[in-house]
Curated annotation (Swiss-Prot):
Pfam families, per database record: Ribosomal_L6 (PF00347)
Keyword field: Ribonucleoprotein, Ribosomal protein, RNA-binding, rRNA-binding
GO biological process terms held by the UniProt record: cytoplasmic translation
Protein name as annotated: Large ribosomal subunit protein uL6
Function description: This protein binds to the 23S rRNA, and is important in its secondary structure. It is located near the subunit interface in the base of the L7/L12 stalk, and near the tRNA binding site of the peptidyltransferase center.
InterPro entries found in the cross-reference section: Ribosomal_uL6-like, Ribosomal_uL6-like_a/b-dom_sf, Ribosomal_uL6_a/b-dom, Ribosomal_uL6_arc, Ribosomal_uL6_CS2
PROSITE patterns on file: RIBOSOMAL_L6_2 (PS00700)
NCBIfam families: PRK05518.1, uL6_arch
Subunit structure: Part of the 50S ribosomal subunit.
Protein family (similarity comment): Belongs to the universal ribosomal protein uL6 family.
Any one cellular-component term (Gene Ontology): cytosolic large ribosomal subunit
Length: 176
């Protein structure tokens, strides 16, 4: 007989979770997130104030996917209650890097003295605030916040120089 794998997640007060077919919708004080979560032989149900993620198959892939789906739902719940915030620091030695936000993009000017600005796209519904030497990235969707941070970091990647000497760029300092 095949054992089933079950993960239970508690739904905190003030959060509403709706599951219909493959889609999971989470509403909270900060807003609403919706996502398609599906894998064969895995079902997602809501029972009272808990979410059940159940797999009938006992294969490694199914065990892993039960944990993955549970982690996605936990991140959605955390996103609508607390949100995610990444703090980045602008580091330069000689040429002062200037950062501006406009039209869903982050414009990075004067990087290593370059005349042409570099651009990084802002993914999804993410808020980017630019300070003097600091950038704050806030949002409900962890993946969108992380991808925006990665886009900014990759836009200031040093190519063709020794990175031990040319340490200019925009780097992640803190995740909350």
């Amino acid at each position: 007989m095949v054992e089933e794998v079950v993960r239970r997640l508690d739904i905190p007060d003030g959060v509403d979770v709706q599951i219909s077919g493959r889609s999971v919708r989470v509403k909270g004080p900060k807003g609403e997130l919706s996502r398609e979560l599906w894998y064969p032989d895995i079902e997602i149900k809501r029972e009272d104030s808990k979410i059940l993620i159940r797999s009938v198959a006992r294969k490694k892939q199914h065990l892993a996917m039960v944990g993955t789906i549970a982690a996605h739902i936990k991140n959605m719940i955390r996103g609508v209650t607390d949100g995610f915030e990444y703090r980045m620091r602008v580091v330069y030695s000689h040429f002062p890097i200037q950062v501006k936000v406009a039209d869903g993009k982050v414009a990075i000017s004067n990087f290593l003295g370059e005349r042409k600005p570099r651009f990084a796209t802002i993914v999804g519904d993410v808020n980017v605030e630019v300070g003097k030497d600091e950038i704050l990235i806030r949002g409900m969707d962890k993946e969108a916040v992380g991808q925006t941070m990665a886009n900014i970091e990759q836009a200031t990647r040093v190519r063709g120089f020794d990175v031990r000497i040319f340490q200019d760029g925009i780097y992640l300092v803190e995740k909350r």
